[in-house]
Amino acid sequence: MTLHNNNTTSPLFPNISSSWIHGPSDTGLPPGTVTHFGSYNISRAAGNLSSPNGTTSDPLGGHTIWQVVFIAFLTGVLALVTIIGNILVIVAFKVNKQLKTVNNYFLLSLACADLIIGVISMNLFTTYIIMNRWALGNLACDLWLSIDYVASNASVMNLLVISFDRYFSITRPLTYRAKRTTKRAGVMIGLAWVISFILWAPAILFWQYFVGKRTVPPGECFIQFLSEPTITFGTAIAAFYMPVTIMTILYWRIYKETEKRTKELAGLQASGTEAEAENFVHPTGSSRSCSSYELQQQSMKRSARRKYGRCHFWFTTKSWKPSAEQMDQDHSSSDSWNNNDAAASLENSASSDEEDIGSETRAIYSIVLKLPGHSTILNSTKLPSSDNLQVPEEELGSVGLERKPSKLQTQQSMDDGGSFQKSFSKLPIQLESAVDTAKASDVNSSVGKTTATLPLSFKEATLAKRFALKTRSQITKRKRMSLIKEKKAAQTLSAILLAFIITWTPYNIMVLVNTFCDSCIPKTYWNLGYWLCYINSTVNPVCYALCNKTFRNTFKMLLLCQCDKRKRRKQQYQQRQSVIFHKRVPEQAL
């Protein structure tokens, strides 16, 4: 966590401890500076008065008993809140299945790092502050520093992973979310911890063996290779300022992309309102064309182009039997729709939620309904216009009629004159599915092929358009809900990032200042800045609760000991469902 050496544990109230030290004041000396007065060794870092054999003259480190009680109480409460808060996060993730999402796996890893800091780092550093010396030996010192730095660096790495995950989820929703699985999240979390361990643990534990001696004085505890301010400055840049810069840039990009999607959604809702007025079917048999509607984000950028989209609504395929062949026939048309023709297509987009399923599949079922109009022969200059739906004569049976699928492809392009071309298939009835990736062979048919017609009432056409408008609102609602989820995740990230910057920046600013001015930072500020970094582990669970309603409700349930009630309600519900099922089985058997 801390990027400077840990030997800045002078008394929290230096004016009190100065009464124990006789001679010139050591105020303003850089961390780790040692001054000698006669037979005494006064360490500016440890702030204790000791004889050459290492015995300490002041057991309270220069503090009064009330100061010790105040420091112990304040830091003890912070450590307890940190431990309880992060344990709540871990237990909530365990008991509530709604929290077992990919994004929350990263928060779980962050909570584990914060829990380690609350259990080990906070308490040992408090002891170090109160006693003004390290009394647990060299091995315990190195182990504490290793755990402290690995857990703190893992927190930074987890924040980086969360930032990149949010960024790719918003900017690359189709490609990234298909690969966004819990297994991949576990790999990323493991890499964050492994990298943190490799960077700090070996150097802290074995540096004294690399250089051949231990230069940390007895009674002090700090990282040996960070005793030089220049090295400390380099580690501060690499381990704090660079990650913070990257996370800030990513969050800014996330914010801009979210705002962009909000504007696009507002435009989509506005186009849906206009479509209700545009899609009025006249009793004479003619109708206006479907208003422009585009689901894909890329098409939204082409605001200068006129778009003739499709109206979408849900459709079931129980009564439809797809054929093995799909007949295509491309024909061009004039720059406008025929007044007697209108098309309504059905589309079912089944996409998995980004937090529940790692991949997305899309099933598209389409059917074109022709409104009553003049029956004409399809040619290269006019759109197909008919009073009835057209079905190949070969597909008509003697006993009953069975609708078969055909493929409809509409392609439109704009030239400089504002005209466009469309390609239509000969058959207006269409059923295509993209769930299975199998590709049916396309067989071209001639223009003069004989067709039969099925009557289509005005009521059916009106019903189709009504479903299309309803589904438009459903798709808009689904997009709005997805955007709300993205905003909530971005809010959680912003809260965590803001807390991280606020709590870590003061100490790292002092590190930079100390590199150029080793007498500008008072001793007390070092201790406060060091402890402020620890407080970040206390604040993180609060950020989860404030920004995530599910976390907040689960925390409340755990604190009020309502887990058993929740389990009992679930068991009672399952029992009721089982009773209902058993009651229905005999009825079905009869």
Swiss-Prot record:
Residues 334-345 have a biased composition (Low complexity). The muscarinic acetylcholine receptor mediates various cellular responses, including inhibition of adenylate cyclase, breakdown of phosphoinositides and modulation of potassium channels through the action of G proteins. Primary transducing effect is Pi turnover. This is Muscarinic acetylcholine receptor M3. The lineage of its organism: Eukaryota, Metazoa, Chordata, Craniata, Vertebrata. Glycans are attached at residues 6-7, 15, 41, 48, 53. Residues 324-357, 398-419 are annotated as: Disordered. Disulfide bonds join 141-221. GO terms for molecular function: G protein-coupled acetylcholine receptor activity; G protein-coupled receptor activity.
